């Protein structure tokens, strides 16, 4: 782990918004100085791809100016369906030698053109294979062009590029170091972290602080919004989003004469689509060798602001479920659920340095 005495910036990029966290990580935990976010208009950023570079430079420059942020070391957290991941078992050697093996033999692990991807690894620990100690790793391959675009974006806005991180890794680091969730939920063995975003959902399964599974799900809060639009066709996306967040409780039954009955029913239909995809991944995880049962589900992102969303997950999956609001070792006075990935990205590990 790399500790720093100065604040750094971490930006989390999604199709719906950019969120930023300014702070530092040390042995006592994470100290957050400031957090900020901005929604992104259509046609600017989609599925990890920068569609309108100049417009994104303008938006990010305005964000930095409004928050008095100048030239500072900056990490970026990204996710995309184009990012490939594979488990592999490698010889028990140093991290430098592991990376050399991966670089030399990458096409044996992942069916990609090595020249088109930047491939790094996460150390999942020691395993016994055919009587020998070996190292289990999770390989993460980011398209070279995607990595280069994001680093160019940081440079164009006057920032100093640091590490390019992956969403699943960022939230895993936060869970591993953050301590008790919401000050009352103790640290456990296995957590399913659900980033319920506006344009995508991400499920990361973190076992003993190590990322085991991470999947990008294209169904998202937008799925619920589309269902609600069928009953409220005159409302804009932003109005429907605000309506969903203002509902008293998405899970509790409403009076039959309530004007919100149709809205809640429609929203649940959209949420059920997301839950179906999440359930498929949970079932896949349960088939893995040395499977560790899930202790609880942790919900964050814009969709976590829907009242009763924790009850929806609890009833749907029959697992304790909580909305992430704070963590014992994260010093920040406000809810962290919109900034969890960015805060996790402040923690720098040698294997995710660019």
Task: For the regions a language model picked out, list residue spans one by one.
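Active-site neighborhood for divalent-cation/phosphate handling
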Residues: 77-179
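Glycine-rich phosphate-binding loop plus the immediately following alpha-helix
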Residues: 45, 148-173, 210-256
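Phosphate/pyrophosphate-binding loops at sites that engage ATP/ADP/AMP, CoA/4′-phosphopantetheine
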Residues: 60-73, 157, 235-239, 279-296
């Amino acid at each position: 782990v790399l500790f720093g005495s100065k604040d750094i910036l971490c930006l989390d990029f999604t199709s719906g918004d950019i969120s930023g966290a300014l702070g530092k990580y040390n042995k006592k935990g994470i100290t957050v100085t400031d957090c900020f976010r901005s929604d992104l208009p259509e046609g600017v950023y989609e599925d990890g791809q920068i569609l309108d570079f100049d417009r994104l430079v303008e938006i990010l420059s305005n964000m930095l100016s409004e928050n008095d942020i100048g030239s500072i070391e900056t990490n970026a957290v990204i996710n995309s369906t184009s990012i490939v991941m594979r488990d592999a078992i490698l010889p028990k050697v140093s991290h430098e030698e592991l990376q050399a093996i991966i670089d030399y033999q990458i096409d044996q692990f992942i069916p990609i053109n090595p020249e088109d991807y930047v491939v790094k690894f996460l150390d999942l620990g020691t395993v016994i294979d055919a009587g020998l100690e070996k190292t289990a790793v999770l390989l993460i391959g980011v398209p070279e062009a995607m990595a280069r675009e994001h680093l160019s974006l940081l440079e164009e806005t006057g920032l100093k590029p640091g590490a390019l991180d992956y969403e699943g890794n960022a939230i895993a680091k936060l869970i591993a170091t953050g301590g008790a969730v919401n000050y009352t939920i103790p640290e456990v063995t296995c957590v399913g972290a659900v980033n319920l975003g506006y344009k995508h959902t991400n499920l990361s399964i973190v076992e003993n602080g190590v990322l085991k599974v991470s999947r990008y799900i294209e169904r998202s809060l937008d799925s619920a919004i589309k269902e609600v639009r069928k009953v409220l066709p005159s409302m804009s996306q932003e109005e429907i989003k605000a309506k969903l967040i203002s509902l008293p409780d998405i899970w509790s039954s409403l009076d039959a004469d309530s004007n919100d009955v149709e809205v809640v029913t429609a929203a649940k239909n959209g949420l059920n689509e997301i839950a179906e995809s999440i359930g498929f991944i949970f079932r896949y995880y349960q088939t893995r060798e040395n499977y560790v049962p899930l202790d609880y589900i942790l919900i964050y992102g814009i969709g976590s602001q829907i009242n009763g969303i924790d009850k929806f997950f609890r009833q749907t999956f029959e697992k304790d479920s909580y909305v992430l609001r704070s963590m014992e070792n994260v010093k920040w006075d406000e809810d962290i659920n919109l900034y969890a990935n960015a805060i996790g990205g402040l923690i720098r590990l040698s294997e995710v340095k660019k």
